[in-house]
Design a protein with these regions (language model features):
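Membrane-anchoring alpha-helices and their flanking helix-loop junctions
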Residues: 3, 10-137, 155-220
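Histidine-centered phosphotransfer motif of kinases
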Residues: 137-138, 142-150
């Protein structure tokens, strides 16, 4: 745990800047280590068990989902200093490199935020089988099927570069296969909800990386 006490008043300007940079890096790393596994686990619970959870009702479904999330969050917070024991230190080159994934993540977020309402982001359509919802195929969803997950990966990569903790590099690597598993589960559920329309959409639009056609290159 990083500590900032009265002693910092005797440090020179450069030392104070380094100290506060350490604090920022540490708490940014905590944010990712806490948020990413909890978010991924939520979908790993919702998607495989969505039919069972629907029968329980929305309130009970969220209570069921919350139990493993709370346990995981508590475990991460308890072992946070062990998880962050390997610190490679502030690296200004990597911090500069983090701008690229951060910028791409922001661009993707701005392009999909109007389509993803809060109920969609917390899994309400999956947990309420009677509400089919709307299949998103316009805007960025006309180029990639899962912009939200691509955005998440870019955020994690940016934070890994900026904080330069081993745990965040490992989190980035582990997130890739886990997100792909979540995507496969999500697509199975979407096929159940939208049938042929979603299958046709999958044939037209790639999952993660947009198609670059000769026409789009010429237009650019």
């Amino acid at each position: 745990m990083l500590a900032v006490g009265p002693r910092h008043r005797y440090l020179n300007i450069e030392e104070k800047q380094n100290m506060w940079l350490q604090v920022v890096r540490y708490y940014m790393a905590i944010l990712i280590l806490f948020g990413v596994p909890v978010g991924l686990l939520m979908w790993l619970v919702i998607h495989p068990f969505h039919k069972l959870l629907r029968h329980a009702g929305l309130v009970w479904a969220y209570l069921f989902v919350a139990i493993p999330l709370i346990l995981l969050a508590g475990t991460i917070l308890w072992f946070r200093d062990v998880l962050l024991a390997t610190d490679y230190g502030a690296n200004y080159l990597l911090m500069a490199l983090s701008v690229a994934p951060f910028a791409l993540a922001v661009a993707i977020y701005l392009s999909h935020r109007k389509y993803l309402t809060l109920p969609i982001q917390v899994g309400v359509p999956e947990l309420t089988g009677g509400q089919k919802g709307v299949l998103l195929t316009e805007g960025i969803y006309g180029h990639i099927r899962h912009p939200r997950y691509v955005e998440s990966v870019l955020w994690i990569l940016g934070y890994a570069f900026f904080t330069n903790y081993l745990a965040l590099y490992l989190a980035f690597l582990l997130t890739l296969p886990v997100i792909h598993i979540i995507v496969l589960l999500e697509e199975k559920e979407l096929k159940e909800r939208f049938g042929h329309d979603y299958e046709e959409y999958c044939r037209r639009v790639p999952r993660y990386i947009p198609k670059i056609t000769w026409r789009s290159q010429k237009a650019a």
